[in-house]
Amino acid sequence: MTWLVGLLLMLGLWIAPAPAHAAADGAALFEAHCVGCHLNGGNIIRRGKTLKLKALERNGIQGPLEIAMIATEGRGQMSGYGEVLGEDGADAVAEWIWQQAQNDWHNGST
């Protein structure tokens, strides 16, 4: 009987949804590497290139994939931060940025 309980616990952990730490990691990465130029989703260098939803869409960015590519490789005056953000960092920060843009940056920590 004990083995059955153990098996059920392991099965429950295996099929449980992934923890929501990607957003937390994205927020931490944003705070550490992006907020200097993009405080509250703005842009202190180029005012029209903010991280607000309207500006993202106007600049052809339709989701986190494009944001991750820009974070990794850079675009225009923005340098790429792929090495700084690490293997999954660009995806995590891009997901977080996209969530904030969807909420008009009202729920962000910055």
Regions found by a protein language model. Give the residues of each.
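Gly/Gly-Pro-rich "capping" loops immediately C-terminal to redox-active cysteine motifs
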Residues: 27, 39-69
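Detector for the c-type heme attachment site
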Residues: 37-43, 83, 98
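Periplasmic c-type cytochrome electron-transfer domains
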Residues: 65-80, 97
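Flexible coil segments in periplasmic/lumen-exposed cytochrome c-class electron-transfer proteins
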Residues: 28-32, 80-110
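A short secondary-structure junction motif
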Residues: 41-44, 74, 100, 104
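Bacterial N-terminal signal peptides
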Residues: 2-14
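Short pre-active-site segment immediately N-terminal to redox-active cysteine/selenocysteine motifs
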Residues: 30-36, 41, 74-77, 89
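Electrostatic cytochrome c docking/interface patches
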Residues: 13-29, 63-66
